[in-house]
């Protein structure tokens, strides 16, 4: 299966969330609940791009708009409040301290990579990771990653710098001791709202695509 690398561009908003295993419907007077094929639910990533003024130089917006027929993307999450980064560590190494533009999404403290401190099996909802070097900065509401999957931290407790977290959705693959734990993770998914993205396209070179909604692809 071909997996495309999602391009890096400025974003106004980004939100990773896991809607859950079921949702209510109105098929009967008492309502109905539909269960997704993924036990424990699935995850989604919503991105609101900022204005893109480089379309004539690199037509990435139109390229994304053409990939709405089930193509799979690997997306690096942009810096956001869901990324545990330098706000917890002091404003020391962030790009704006040396005049660089922070919007390039590079060189953030959130790029720190921890290691997993315990093995965990696919389908589990608990993981342990060692944050030696940055300290216990990951809190409920932050995201962490393993491989090309992202997980939302629901609960976490610490013994020193080792955190044990309950996460959603359940683990998509086995974790081994020493595997990388990404504080700025990757997400693998498919775009499911192509018409919304295309509606704002024009040929003037100043493009602000509509919100991009990616639904998790388990590959």
Please report, for each region that a protein language model flagged, where it lies by residue.
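Extracellular/virion structural assembly segments
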Residues: 1-219
């Amino acid at each position: 299966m071909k997996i495309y690398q999602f391009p890096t561009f400025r974003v106004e908003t980004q939100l990773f969330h896991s809607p859950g295993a079921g949702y209510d419907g109105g098929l009967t007077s008492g309502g109905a609940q539909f269960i997704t094929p993924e036990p424990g639910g699935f995850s989604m990533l919503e991105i609101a791009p900022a204005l893109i003024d480089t379309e004539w130089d690199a037509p990435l917006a139109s390229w994304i708009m053409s990939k709405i027929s089930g193509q799979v993307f690997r997306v690096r999450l942009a810096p956001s409040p869901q990324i545990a980064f330098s706000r917890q560590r002091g404003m020391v190494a962030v790009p704006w301290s040396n005049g660089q533009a922070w919007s390039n999404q590079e060189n953030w403290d959130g790029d720190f990579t921890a290691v997993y401190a315990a093995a965990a099996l696919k389908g589990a909802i608990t993981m342990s990771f060692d944050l030696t070097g940055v300290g216990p900065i990951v809190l409920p509401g932050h995201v962490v990653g393993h491989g090309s999957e992202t997980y939302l931290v629901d609960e976490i407790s610490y013994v020193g710098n080792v955190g044990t977290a309950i996460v959603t959705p359940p683990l998509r693959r086995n974790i081994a001791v020493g595997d990388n734990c990404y504080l700025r993770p990757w997400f693998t998914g498919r775009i499911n709202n192509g018409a919304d993205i295309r509606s704002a396209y024009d040929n003037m070179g100043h493009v602000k695509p509509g919100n991009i909604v990616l639904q998790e692809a388990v590959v």
